[in-house]
C-alpha cells in the first residue's frame, strides 16, 4: 500500500512546482506531517466569499462524507481540547487535488495538515516543528463556500489555503450541543461580505 504521507508530501511539492520524483520526499517533510497544528489564521481568497458567523458544522452530517475517500486528518489543539478535522477527496470533478474538510468525533484520526488551493494541488498550512514554533510556509487557512452545483453539501463550508495575508479571517473554537466546531470570529476582508449568487471557477 502506498504511504499516504509520501503521496501528500509529493502533491505539496508539486503544487509549488517541485517534482517529488526528482528531489525525493525527505524524512523531515514526513515528520512535519506528523506534527500537530495548535493555531489557525485564515485568509479569504478574492474569487469567493465568506459568510461571517459561518463555520464548519459538518459533524452532525458526518455520514455525508462517509462515501468520500479519506486522505487523513489534522489534530488541532485550542489549548483546552483537541478538535479533529478530516480532509476528503471530492466527487464533483472540480479538480483531482481539491480536498475538503469536516470536523470529526473520531479521535483516532490524527495528522494531515495539508489543505488545497483550488486546482493547484496541496500546500502546507501550518505545522509545529521540533522547537514547537509555528511553520506556515506563507500559506493561510481560508474558508470558501461550496459552489452552487454542490447541492449535496449545501450550507457547508470548504477550507482552503491562500497566500495573501492581507485578507485575514480569524477563527475560534465554539461548542454547540457538546460538540466543538471552528467558527469565523473576525473577517478582515470586508469585500468578502458580499456573497455572490454564483462562484465562477478561478482561472
UniProtKB/Swiss-Prot annotation:
> GO MF annotations for this entry?
carbohydrate binding
Activity relative to temperature: Thermostable. Activity unaffected after incubation for 30 minutes at 30-70 degrees Celsius. Retains 50% of its maximal activity after incubation at 80 degrees Celsius for 30 minutes.
Write out the entry's keywords from A to Z: Hemagglutinin, Lectin, Signal
Q: Signal: present as a keyword of the record?
A: yes
Q: Note the superkingdom of the native organism.
A: Eukaryota
Q: What is stated about pH in the biophysicochemical properties?
A: Optimum pH is 6.0-8.0. No activity below pH 3.0 or above pH 11.0.
Asked whether the keyword Hydrolase is assigned, the reply is no
| Signal peptide from the UniProt entry | 1-20
What extra comment accompanies this record?
Answer: Divalent cations are required for ligand binding. Calcium is the most effective, but manganese or zinc can also be used to a lesser extent.
User: What is the protein's quaternary organization?
Assistant: Monomer.
Q: What name goes with this protein? A: Lectin
